[in-house]
Design a protein with these regions (language model features):
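Catalytic Walker B motif of ABC-type/P-loop ATPase nucleotide-binding domains
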Residues: 118-121
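Conserved catalytic motifs of ABC-family nucleotide-binding domains
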Residues: 114
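Conserved beta-strand-loop-alpha-helix hinge in the C-terminal portion
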Residues: 173-196
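ABC ATPase NBD Q-loop/coupling interface
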Residues: 18-32
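Conserved ABC ATPase signature
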Residues: 93-97, 101
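Conserved ABC ATPase "signature" region
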Residues: 71-89
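H-loop/switch region of ABC-family ATPase nucleotide-binding domains
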Residues: 153-154
Length: 204
């Protein structure tokens, strides 16, 4: 649903409501919207191109497609790989990495494009606690850089720690929205099957 909403000309079917980017409905944008929004898939394996032999080349792939000069590509890729702590993996094959490493490569491949908006779909669903921590360190860095981040996540502890605004969906419908403190202290949501943080339950 998130992807369909941001690509209305690609996915067919009935779509209700609207999404505005810079005050303009996304349906009125052309291909230039692709330069403003970065999408990180739930499964990093589906994001890896499969045509590049090294992590460095994989991270550079999007910039090559946008026609960025080689010197700038090298500079931006080196910087983002250092930021995401994958510089030591530069010469490794992306398809031979661990799940956590591959997810960081997928993130770096999007971040190097410098999008204004990041859509991240359950980035830790297949990761162990260490991999989860490393990925959310990167998300926090992007948040500190004032990037707009739309995070699809089911783990309530991560939502409690990193979110500012929370939207709760059930059966494809929005059932609650508001600031984090308001949503995570709403006991009525438990009747909808939403698991609230233990501290919120104890304090009720």
């Amino acid at each position: 649903a998130i992807l369909r909403g941001f690509a209305p000309s690609f996915y067919q079917g009935e779509i209700q409501g609207e999404v505005l980017v810079y005050g303009k409905p996304i349906g009125e944008y052309g291909g230039e919207l692709a330069t403003k929004i970065g999408y990180v898939f739930q499964n990093p394996f589906t994001q890896i191109s499969g045509v590049k032999e090294t992590v460095f080349e994989e991270v550079a792939y999007g910039l090559e497609n946008f026609g960025v000069p080689v010197e700038e590509i090298v500079e931006r890729v080196e910087a983002i790989m250092k930021l995401t702590h994958i510089d030591s993996l530069a010469e490794k094959n992306p398809l031979e990495l661990s799940g956590g490493q591959m997810q960081r490569v997928a993130l770096a491949s999007v971040l190097v494009l410098e999008p204004d908006i990041l859509i991240i779909d359950e980035p830790t669903s297949q990761l162990d606690p260490q991999g989860t921590e490393s990925v959310f360190e990167i998300i926090k860095m992007m948040k500190d850089k004032k990037k707009t981040i739309i995070l699809v996540e089911h783990k309530i502890d991560l939502i409690a720690e990193y979110a500012d605004e929370v939207l709760v969906l059930k059966g494809g419908k929005l059932i609650a929205s508001g600031d984090k403190a308001q949503i995570l202290s709403d006991m009525a949501l438990m009747e909808q099957g939403v698991q609230l943080p233990q501290m919120a339950i104890l304090g009720s």
